[in-house]
C-alpha cells in the first residue's frame, strides 16, 4: 500500500485460533500446572503446547529418531527447549556456573546453545525437569518469561567491549525497556516458583488480555556496529552520543525477516526511520509502538500479523503519528549515524576503561566438550576465576568482559588449553546458522549441522580464486521463518527440503539490504557451482573494498530489493 491509499487500521474478520487460546488461557495459565503432573505423556497437551511458549519454552522432539519410535508404537521423544531472558546478553559468572551444571545434569544433549538473540537455550529438557529449570534460573536471578510467542522478546544491545561507558548506558536502557514491556500476569510465578495465588485480578495495561498479535523484537544499537542486525527487528533504538555520553535515540520500526515459501503476501523488510527522541521519552515511545501494534496488528492471519505488515497496511506516516499521539511527543529529525560492520572482533580488545575483553568465536553458538576441544569445561574453568561478566553476542559468540591486566594471561591460558582460541578463517567468523535438525519442529533442511563442512568448501573456493583472507557474510536458516537471519546476508541459504535450499544473493556486509532469491530449491553441489563462478568474478572484477553482496548488485548479477512489500518476489 502506498501512503496515498492506506488500508484499514484494524483488519476485520474471523480471529485466528491463537487469539481464542490467549483469551481462554486466564492470563497464560491454561492448565499447564495440571499437565505437569500427567506422567502418561512426555509432552504438553492441547492449548498448553502453545501456552508454554509464553513461559519461554518450545515443545520439540528428536527428529532423527521420530520414525524409529513410530515403528515401535512409541510417542515422539518429547523434550523442551528453554530460552532465557537475558537483555543485552550479559550474564554473571555465578549464573554461568549454574546453567553449566543444569545442562550437564538435566538435559538430553548436555550442551548450552548461544543464540543470535544474545541469550542461551537448553535443548532436551524432559518434562520432569521443566519446573526445576525455572527454579534454578530464579535462584540465580534469571527467568525465561516472554522469550517466545506473542510478546516483546529478549531485548538486544550492541556488545561493544571498547566504549565501556556508552555500552553501560545503552545496556541499562535495554534492561529498562525489557522490564517495562514484560507481561504483568502472575502465571509464571505461580506455576514455576510456587508463589501464592493472590485474590487480585490480573491486568495487562500494555500487552492487553490477548497480548500482541505476533512476536515482537526490540534492539538497542550503538553505531558504527550493527552486530545486532537491527533490520531483523520490530523496534530499534539507535544510540546517539555526544562526547561519549548517550543523549537520545533514533527510532526505526518495522523490520522483520520471516517469510513463507511461495506466499507472496509475506516478505522480509528493513526497518523504517521514524525520528530522533531524547532519552527521557524512551519508555513512553517504546510503549506507544507496542500498543499501536497491539491494537492495529492483524489478528485474523498470523502470517500477516507482524509490525512490518501493519506499517505497510496503514502507512508509515499514519503509524508514526499514532505513536507520537500515544507517547505525547513529536519526533525530531533523524540524527546522523552510520554502520561500518556487524561482525565481532575476535580476540583481545582493550576498552577505554583499561580493562581487557576477550571475544571467543563459538561456531554456531554450540557449547559442548568436543574431542580435543573441551569448550564447555574451558568456559566453566574461566567462570570459576573471572571476576567480571560474560556477554553473549548476536553473532553467537561469547565475550569474557572486563578482564584486568593481572588476570589476562591466566584467562588466555585457560582459553587456549580448551580450544577456545583456535585460529579460524575470516569466512568462518562471518558464517552463522540456526539450530534446525534434529530438534526444531519447523526445520525443512539442515543448518547448524550443515554449515561447518559447507564453510570448508566456501573457504576452498576463496583460496582457489586467490582471496583466502576475504569473507562473505553467509547464513543458513533451516526454514523460511529465518532464525538464522539469512535474509540479511550476502549469501543466504533458506531450507526448502532435506538437502535443498533457496539461494539468496545481494545483501550487504553491514546488514542494511535484503537479498533476493537467485536460485530456488537447489542442492549443495549446485550452490557451490554458482558460488565458484560468482566468487571468481568478484575476485577479478571487484572495486577496492567492495564486498561480495555489493558486487553482485553492481555487476547486474542480482537486482537489489528496494521496496520489499512490492518487489521482494520479483
Swiss-Prot record:
**Protein encoded by which gene:** cysI
Task: Identify the domain of life.
Answer: Bacteria
SUPFAM superfamilies associated with the record: Nitrite and sulphite reductase 4Fe-4S domain-like, Nitrite/Sulfite reductase N-terminal domain-like
Similarity comment: family membership: Belongs to the nitrite and sulfite reductase 4Fe-4S domain family.
Stored PROSITE patterns? NIR_SIR (PS00365)
Gene3D superfamilies from the entry? Sulfite Reductase Hemoprotein, domain 1
The record lists [4Fe-4S] cluster as bound by 434, 440, 479, 483
This protein's species is: Salmonella dublin (strain CT_02021853)
**Which protein is depicted?**
Sulfite reductase [NADPH] hemoprotein beta-component
Looking up NCBIfam families in the UniProt record yields: CysI, PRK13504.1
The reaction(s) this protein catalyses? hydrogen sulfide + 3 NADP(+) + 3 H2O = sulfite + 3 NADPH + 4 H(+)
List the InterPro entries: CysI, NiRdtase/SiRdtase_haem-b_fer, Nit/Sulf_reduc_fer-like_dom_sf, NO2/SO3_Rdtase_4Fe4S_dom, NO2/SO3_Rdtase_4Fe4S_prot, NO2/SO3_Rdtase_4Fe4S_sf, NO2/SO3_Rdtase_FeS/sirohaem_BS
Any signal peptide, and if so, which residues?
none
